[in-house]
Amino acid sequence: MRFGREDFAYSLPPSDRALAKDDFIWVDIGCCMLASTSDVNRIAKAGRVTDEEQSIYTQVRNITTATLSAIRPGMTGADVYGAFEAFAKQTELGLPSATASRIGHGSGRNLTEPPSIAATSKEVIHEGMIIHVEPKYEMCGGVFQLEEVAVVTKNGAEFITTLSAERFPEILL
């Protein structure tokens, strides 16, 4: 879990800082069941969400779900990344910063395993794989990243996460 404004690097050390009004909250939650691992992330804001923040949230949610919905068996990680680029370029957001070299991954026995969803990934996606899509946009002092997870079926991706809320969640202090 990270909260604050501006700096959402995964590698930051823990802090005693208290949650404050207008902080962005980013949570990445993992689990393990029957030797399989997975994770999902969600965001919220401590305070009222602005119209601009809601617009960004909605666009990131739409890009994420459209990318995952486009997955079919036989695609490579690069094919999925190409779909992500096409969806992102259709929005006001465009592509995220250079941190978006990888926007997703598989999971199973390990939390992060092939295929990587990246521009250079030649790894092939097969029916039965679990795929995570999580493009990360850092803007307006916050992080906008909603990780959605699906199992790949012969007909495409079937979401196995409860989709992120349509409205950017607010925690009123």
Regions found by a protein language model. Name each.
Residues 1-173:
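Active-site neighborhoods and metal-handling regions in enzymes and metal-associated proteins
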